[in-house]
A protein has these predicted regions:
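Short conserved beta-strand and strand-loop elements enriched in small hydrophobics
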Residues: 2-6, 144-152, 200
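A structural micro-motif recognizing beta-strand termini
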Residues: 30-34, 55, 151-152, 178-183, ...
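Short, solvent-exposed secondary-structure boundary/capping segments
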Residues: 25-30, 171-177
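PDZ domains, with a preference for the canonical peptide-binding region formed by the helix
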Residues: 1-10, 217-219, 224-228
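Short coil-to-beta-strand transition motifs
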Residues: 10-11, 32-38, 153-160
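Catalytic nucleophile loop of clan PA
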Residues: 188-209
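Charged, low-complexity helical/coil segments in non-catalytic cytosolic or luminal regions
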Residues: 43, 48-174, 212-218
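PDZ-domain C-terminal substructure recognizer with occasional recognition of PDZ-binding tails
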Residues: 1-28
């Protein structure tokens, strides 16, 4: 069977094979979504080019990486923080005004994050040259004290973590860490959904970004090396 469909306003064709059922009829299974959205964190800017999340965007139902040709990035108004508990990761909840809050475009969905460009006027207004910092090579990253940077309550704050282990042979679980900051634990329970992409700084250098929460202990999580996001 030849199936014609629209993607990004363009007509495309795919060959599919229906399955014959025990009722002597044919059925075709399709998984169709027009778009996908979620809350995450921008990790870094270089000019007006950005990277975010630290991992790919995947479909919640199938777990498969989304094959995307583009999208938009929006400012999000956080309205509620559902704290994480053991075996129950929390999440950031927010609202997006799609016509008002568009600040850039997403050009790619990669294994170690999403990337694209922010509006130049938005960058000039919200980011200052004085905030720039060096990035660290993986061999500079050490176990011990580091900080997660986040705007969970609207203001930029840094939260102390302890890097427990370093792995150079994995894609985006390069660091294991434990949240030590009592304010962050009180606010989120540790790590929650929506914090993916939150930058991690050690010794004044950007070393990586939060990627995953440990379900059995939400005060622990994983992070990706910043170098792997840049690649």
């Amino acid at each position: 069977m030849r199936l014609t469909f629209l993607r990004d306003g363009k007509s495309q064709v795919a060959e599919v094979t229906p399955v014959k059922t025990n009722k002597n009829s044919y059925m075709l299974g399709l998984w169709v979504k027009d778009d996908i959205s979620g809350i995450g964190t921008v990790t870094f800017l270089c000019g007006n080019q950005f990277m975010a999340l630290g991992h790919s965007v995947s479909d919640n139902d199938t777990g498969l990486k989304i094959s995307s040709t583009g999208g938009g990035i929006y400012t999000t108004h956080i309205t509620k923080i559902n704290r994480s508990f053991v075996s129950m990761p929390g999440q950031l909840q927010g609202t997006i005004l799609y016509k008002k809050d568009l600040i850039g475009i997403v050009e790619g969905n990669y294994d170690n994050g999403i990337g694209g460009y922010l509006d130049e006027e938005y960058v000039a207004k919200h980011y200052k040259a004085a905030e720039a910092m060096y990035i660290a090579d993986p061999d500079e990253v050490q176990t011990g004290e580091a900080y997660i940077y986040s705007r969970l309550d609207g203001d930029l704050k840094k939260y102390k973590i302890n890097i427990l282990a370093i792995h150079t042979d994995t894609a985006n679980k390069n660091m294991e860490f434990k949240v030590e900051d009592e304010d962050l634990i009180a606010l989120t329970g540790g790590v929650c959904q929506g914090m993916s992409g939150s930058p991690i700084v050690q010794n004044g250098k950007l070393i990586g970004a939060v990627t995953h929460v440990l379900v059995d202990d939400p005060t622990e999580g994983y992070a990706v090396f910043i170098e792997n996001m840049i690649k």
